[in-house]
Amino acid sequence: MLKQNPPYREWGLILMKFLASIDVMPIKEILDPQGKAVLLGLKNLDIQGFGDCRIGKHINMEIEAADKATAESIVEDACKKLLANLIMEEYTFELTAI
């Protein structure tokens, strides 16, 4: 379990800390060569039972913001501008106060 830190002040504002858990995955319409390679490897190792496989990224980041809505806005901005290629990828995230 994560240790909870109390909010702290910066320039008179009380900032809270959040953990953003971000998942970035290729959109379903795009061929995923890494996923296909994993399925082929499993088949070659005679490991049965897997259907589709898609390989993506999982990112954990700490965010400091005045409130949860502001933290969500910061994470959305980071995902749209840097962490995900919106032409080929989609993202989801969860925020947890720490």
Label every model-predicted segment:
Residues 3-15:
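Short, Lys/Arg-enriched N-terminal segments with co-localized hydrophobic residues
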Residues 1-2, 28:
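Residue-level detector of alpha-helical hydrophobic segments embedded in or interacting with membranes
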Residues 12-58, 62-98:
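Long, contiguous binding/interaction regions
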